[in-house]
Amino acid sequence: MITHAMEGSKTFNIPTFVLDENCNFIPDVLSRANAKFIKEVLIRDSYNAVCLANSFIPMATQTVEQILIIITKFKFSRSRDLLMSVFRLGVHINRFYAGKNQVKHMITMMKSLFDTEEAMRQLDRALMGLFVDARDNSYMPLIALSLHENGLPDSKFIKAVRLIQTTVNSFHNRPDADIEQYAEKLRAYNYLYKIPKYSLKEAVDIYSDNLKDLTIGVNKKPTLLFTSSDDAYLSHIYNDLLFLTSTWNMIYNCKKEIRRLNTWIKYEINSIMETAVLVGFQLPDLKETILDLAALISNMNLVSPDKELFPHYKLILAKLFEICIFATKANICILPSFIKGHLIEFEDVLKRSNDDEDLNYLLLKSRDSDDEYDEDKPPIQVDPGRVDNVLTDSDFFNVTPENAFSSIAIMPISYDKTIDVEDNEIQVLEVEMQSLSAVVYGAVASKYGLSLEQVIRKLNRNEGRTSSRASPSHSTSTVPYSPPQSDRSTPTSILRQRVPMRSNSRSSSVSFSQEDSNRSHYSDETNISDYSYPMADLELEDEEPMEDHPHSPQSTSSNNSMSRQSRALQNGQRRRAPTMVPSSQTRRQNNARPRRVARRLTEMMNDARL
């Protein structure tokens, strides 16, 4: 057993009943069938470690992680990445649920010690007998008023113990032999308990039983020395007061660990959501199950902090085990991080590519061909930027238009972009959140037949905001949309679905930036592409002052129909003009041609709209 190596140097035994057939899972947390699945997946030593970490013994979260060693059997190693995260989450949820009930029971039992008027008078007499000096007497109410669940954090506990130890001069205090080693038995059922310097082995035995009953949930009032007999000695009061302060400090630390664990659980769940979506790329049959999971996580994220979260945790955990069982039966190796890496690379290719380029070629191209092998030639170094075509190969992922996850836009994205949702087709999307990477909103939108734009606007409306529309272009001048931020985080970002833009002809085209931020492409049979110079790239040799320019921003509103490209046409015309200063008549002729071109372009735009 795991604990044999620890028993040699101890005077007590770690409880042997921390292992059970249900892996110490409470039936309200995990079903017996799912607990049996854990036992089937893990090797024996790992199963024992999970049972110990999953036991009722209160311990720090970092101690749980040291004990929790998850090792799957070889036949389940293909799904190891998914199984490890789900099993760890299950242990944390079980400890969270058990810990809350445990702390509630401890508080009830400890408060029952002095729930009557007679018991309170007995405590007052004991304290007055211990703190006999006038100087020490002022400490008595400071300690008595701190005996509750929120009264003794570590800092106050240390001060209280020091104050109690100052009373040893009021009686003959001679500790029993080897009392410190003997007192280690108090940690057998509670790893959060801090052991003060007791003086009586008799007291340690009683307090050990008290801690055991408090930990495992026995409905029995704790026993104290000065209340269990008519003859109350000062040494009894001294040890009892140390027990009271140390136990209330332990309860405070238990509550603190439960709060920490709750925060970690919420983060784990949202992180596993991303893993589940990546698994869905490899197992498209899980699409509906993952959408159900996304809806559950979305509901959890919207719960107020003062509400109970365990019902949400229970449903989410059951759905995750459903995914795990399906994944272990599939004849495929589950590699979420591998898939995410290729998705990021695929998106980077989309970001750099032009609309008329073949994505398959971009994903597979390299500077040299390594398809043919020649033993006389040295090995060819493949381009480091090359990636295998794992995303567009339908045989690898069995991705079809009917089951592709990209069609509902619930994957994370690696670049900051701006939001624009047009005709239910997502071109560019960004959602800024605080800490979690849940990808639930797009999934919920798809599940309930809503467009993602409707979901975003609904979220804005709930927070009293208006939705922000931005250009689908990659310009950095667009304003990003920031959804409502709260203590419950939501997706960092969501995958954009690149919508190819179609040109009206095969000839050269010019892109026009309209005031409504929609992009259109128009072609001209004439050599219009000669005039399409970006304005920022021009080096004008004969630039007129801005205030005198007929198309400057300070001109009248009648000139606002001129787009930036039309102004670039005029600048390009001047660039090809001689460097010598032309006459006024020549200048008017040169200025007339760009205006004619601009009018023609405006007419073409109006015709295209009609």
UniProtKB/Swiss-Prot annotation:
Gene name linked to the record: U14
A Pfam entry, by short name: Herpes_pp85
Entry comment on modification after translation: Phosphorylated.
InterPro entries recorded: Herpes_pp85
Main localisation: virion
Cellular location(s): Virion tegument; Host cytoplasm
Polar residues bias (residue ranges): 484-495, 581-592
Protein's organism: Human herpesvirus 6B (strain Z29) (HHV-6 variant B)
Bias type Basic and acidic residues, positions: 600-610
Keyword Magnesium: no
Keywords, alphabetical: Host cytoplasm, Phosphoprotein, Virion, Virion tegument
A GO CC term attached to the entry: host cell cytoplasm
Bias (Low complexity): 467-478, 503-515, 552-567
Protein name: Phosphoprotein 85
Region (Disordered): 462-530, 543-610
